[in-house]
Regions:
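Dinucleotide-binding Rossmann-like beta1-alpha1 core, especially the glycine-rich loop
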Residues: 27-115, 266-271
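Mid-domain catalytic core of redox enzymes
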Residues: 218-258
Length: 352
């Protein structure tokens, strides 16, 4: 928005927990996103198509290396049952792509091993799905670069501000944080797990829930695994990240031995040589999920000029959020098929 000449203040609260923007896996992903919502499939595809230019521009502006790689991504299967389930999933996703641009295929174990010549696959590996549109990025560098670009172009960053109250009167919003007051004619709520509470203050119902994911990180080693997966990826520095756990419920970001053990065991079943690496770090972070795990984009009917945005795919969709959503908010240019992302889909009576 600052690139379009808007005067923007970013209010960020105090949060000592590891949030999704800092604790994520860094995937720029298509193949597993959008089941049951064709518009979301196309949204993710368009976002990945915009990512190379988005990354290049951000690196040139800020000097941060995002380490963005669009190598394609894998989902590796263990056993025939997982393999068949994946076949069914990919077929359903392919049929859901209205444009026919969803590019994902199943590959055999032999083909998979030929793609990974420097590391041996486990005996139970039965094949994988491969999506040429997938890739990965260093998430902390992305966050730093976006914050840097925002401030370089005139944006004002106000950290350690917890919004306590939002009022709307005479086409103007007043935001109170306890230490400061802010006024604006347009308000964008992108508050992660606080979105539900904040959106209610301006007449919007946006349900979000936390889901904990835990991650293990190994020591650095030579690059041998060139394709990211949702469970295993090798970072630019050579360390491996292992993850993909899902625990719904509370706001606890602690790790648990049982879950970390399960993550490690599955990773070793896929890549047995990982057992030779030392584990050096682990963490838990909270995903921000709507009931169907799809995005919500909404303008308030009660308080025009207030918008709510929430998505589990913040990294994957960063390229499209910084372009098309800006046009929606500043220029009222509503993207085609945007009603699919309205939260009325969670209310059966309203959706009919």
């Amino acid at each position: 928005m600052v690139k379009k000449g808007a005067k923007v203040i970013l209010i960020d609260r105090v949060d000592n927990r590891l949030t999704a923007s800092r604790g994520n896996f860094g995937l720029v992903w298509v193949q597993g996103k959008g089941k049951g919502m064709p518009r979301y499939v196309e949204w993710c595809i368009e976002a990945t198509e915009r990512w190379p230019e988005f990354a290049e521009n951000l690196e040139n502006e800020t000097g941060f290396n995002l380490n963005y790689e669009k190598t394609g991504g894998l989902e590796i299967c263990l056993g025939e049952e997982e393999h068949q389930e994946r076949i069914n999933f990919i077929e359903e996703m392919s049929q859901a792509s209205n444009s026919g641009r969803y590019d994902c295929e199943m590959i055999s174990k032999k083909k998979l091993q030929s793609m990974l010549p420097k590391i041996k696959l486990g005996k139970e590996v039965s094949g994988a799905s491969f999506c040429s549109q997938d890739g990965c990025v260093t998430p902390l560098n992305l966050l730093k670069a976006m914050n840097s670009s925002f401030q370089q172009k005139g944006g004002t960053y106000r950290p350690e501000q917890t919004v306590q109250k939002i009022e709307f009167s005479s086409n103007e919003f007043k935001i109170e944080t306890g230490t400061h007051n802010f006024k604006t004619e347009k308000l964008v709520i992108a508050g992660g797990l606080m979105t539900t509470k904040l959106a209610k203050m301006v007449g919007m119902e946006v349900p979000v829930i936390p889901e904990r994911g835990q991650i293990l990180v190994t020591e650095r080693t030579s690059r041998v695994f060139n394709y990211p997966t949702a469970e295993i990826r090798q970072n630019y520095d050579g360390s491996f990240m292992l993850g993909s756990s899902h625990e719904a419920g509370d706001y606890d970001t602690d790790t648990s031995y049982e879950v970390l053990q399960k993550i490690a065991k599955r990773a070793i079943r896929i890549l047995p040589n990982l057992k030779n690496l030392q584990l050096i770090r682990s963490w838990g972070a909270l995903r921000v999920l709507t009931p169907d795990q799809k995005p919500v984009y909404l303008e308030s009917d009660q308080c025009p000029g207030a918008y709510a945005i929430t998505s589990h795919s913040g990294v994957s969709l960063a390229s499209i959020h910084s372009s098309i959503l800006v046009e929606w908010i500043l220029e009222e240019r509503i993207p085609p098929g945007f009603t699919a992302f309205h939260p009325k889909r969670f209310n059966v009576q309203e959706a009919i």
